[in-house]
Amino acid sequence: MRVIGLMSGTSYDAVEAAAADLELEGEALVMRPLGHLSAPYPDGLRDLIADSLPPAAATVRTVARLDTGIGQAFADVAVRAVRELCGGAAGLVVSHGQTLYHWVEDGAVRGTLQLGQPAWIAEATGLPVVSDLRGRDVAAGGQGAPLVAMTDVLAMAALPGVPAALNLGGIANVTVVAPGAEPLAFDTGPANALMDAAVRHFTGGAAAFDEDGRRAGAGRVDPGLLRVLLDDPYYGRPAPKSTGKEQFHLPYLLAALAAAPVAEPDDVLATLARLTAVTVADACRAHGVTRLVVSGGGARNPVLMGMIAEELPGVDLGSSDALGLPSDAKEALAFALLGFLTVNGLPGAIPSGTGARRASLLGSITPGREPLRLPEPAGEPPRVLRVVGGP
């Protein structure tokens, strides 16, 4: 089946699309990536998203505008993906949507909201769409995150030692696959979220992120600010756990700076990069990780990657590209995989990773132009991901 995955992460800067041919062969799920593309959100829509994220408040009218605008932006990218990546023919679109709110109380997730009306995608492409992938896991008592864990576990199944997959988006999440143990997956804390917020704040919105980590590389880590940031109780909570920009946002950073003032913006950025490195490393050390497979936007930040390497001496650090999963496309491919599992009657969440009571079939299906025809339910779930070929 030819599947398109659509994703926009907590950095909410663009819609990412990746396409792949997916097939079940015995214990293997065989993936042949077909390519990926990215399109920035229209400026007005991106600004509306930014203005609506916590701790800001949004009206129901704004939520409706966002649901339509994000759905239309995803639909535009899906049409391009069908044409440019799939030669005009695909069988399924899987849309993560845009997370606007992840509702956590006392460590338990009560709800999660991803916007981007899938009907726009189905109407534009004529294809069935799997969407709203997180809600079912939350209803089963899980965190609804990190859902990339299924792809991580399958991709690392044959690796020796104790491999872990690290995704550095707005939030950092890690999946640990230790021999003889259930897989573990959780959010370690902020990755780009606080750094991006700091850059926008210090530049008055002229820049959205620290390109190549240049400003962090020019700064010095401030021990006082780092101590204040590391005092957050989130880091001491046991996994499974998840977080988001509901917690790690600009007012959070400004409160930390009020407690531990830092004069130079570059020093703030260096400290935030070190915060990510320390919290990632603490999580990896706690589980004896020997190899770290990195993906996401933060993987392109050499200063951040260097700090993680400094914090984890002796750990083999590399890109998910080595496993056949391009770092920039991995999340979109992961959601393509989850939607493929759904239409084949297979669960997409890992209870030991999300904390759910059971492994659930994920998502809701919006039919395309033709009557909905699903494959016969598969028997056993795959145990390994085999990536072949490529674009």
UniProtKB/Swiss-Prot annotation:
GO MF term set: ATP binding; kinase activity; phosphotransferase activity, alcohol group as acceptor
EC code: 2.7.1.170
UniProt binding sites for ATP: G9, T10, S11, Y12, D13, A14, V15, E16
Listed GO biological process terms: 1,6-anhydro-N-acetyl-beta-muramic acid catabolic process; amino sugar metabolic process; peptidoglycan turnover
Superkingdom, taxonomy of origin: Bacteria
Keyword terms of this UniProt record: ATP-binding, Carbohydrate metabolism, Kinase, Nucleotide-binding, Transferase
Gene3D superfamilies: 3.30.420.40
UniProt key word Kinase: yes
Pfam families assigned: AnmK
Database matches in InterPro entries: Anhydro_N_Ac-Mur_kinase, ATPase_NBD
Top EC class of this enzyme: transferase
Reactions mediated catalytically: 1,6-anhydro-N-acetyl-beta-muramate + ATP + H2O = N-acetyl-D-muramate 6-phosphate + ADP + H(+)
UniProt-listed CDD domains: ASKHA_NBD_ANMK (cd24050)
Glycoprotein found in the keyword field: no
Pathway named in the protein's UniProt entry: Amino-sugar metabolism; 1,6-anhydro-N-acetylmuramate degradation; Cell wall biogenesis; peptidoglycan recycling
HAMAP family: AnhMurNAc_kinase (MF_01270)
Family membership: Belongs to the anhydro-N-acetylmuramic acid kinase family.
Protein name: Anhydro-N-acetylmuramic acid kinase
Gene source species: Streptomyces coelicolor (strain ATCC BAA-471 / A3(2) / M145)
Gene behind this protein: anmK
